Amino acid sequence: MRHGKAGRKLNRTASHRKAMFANMAASLIEHEQIVTTLPKAKEIRPIVEKLVTLGKRGDLHARRQAVSQIRDVAVVAKLFDAIASRYATRNGGYLRIMKAGFRQGDNAPLAVIEFVDRDADAKGSKDRARVAAEAEAAEAA
């Protein structure tokens, strides 16, 4: 019987699930919005919410915990610098999931998962250059 078994398997091994969630969390933090299937979106939400809470804590141990989970130092830097400060006064509820119809090939239910109050201009690697340019302009002024 399946009593008391939390979480979805998503037809993957435990290691595959862990790697997939790490990659999805990194993409979500980098781009601030991703399109995925509804069950994956529902599973990734608590993972990223806990990462944002780690970012708000801001100490070295929290940063190391975040790096051990998503394994991308640049994304962790964005999480701790930009995203954590944006949600400093908010207690949870950093993400929203919106249903986005069905996928053409297999009719899987899709969802958009995004940060509430997200930066609409965030575009991954291009965004890092833009943020750096804005920081330099702010320092010069």
Curated annotation (Swiss-Prot):
It comes from the Bacteria. The keyword Ribonucleoprotein applies. GO terms for cellular component: cytosolic large ribosomal subunit. GO terms for biological process: translation. The keyword rRNA-binding does not apply. Keywords: Ribonucleoprotein, Ribosomal protein. Pfam families: Ribosomal_L17. GO terms for molecular function: structural constituent of ribosome. InterPro entries: Ribosomal_bL17 (IPR000456), Ribosomal_bL17_CS (IPR047859), Ribosomal_bL17_sf (IPR036373). Belongs to the bacterial ribosomal protein bL17 family. Part of the 50S ribosomal subunit. Contacts protein L32. This is Large ribosomal subunit protein bL17.
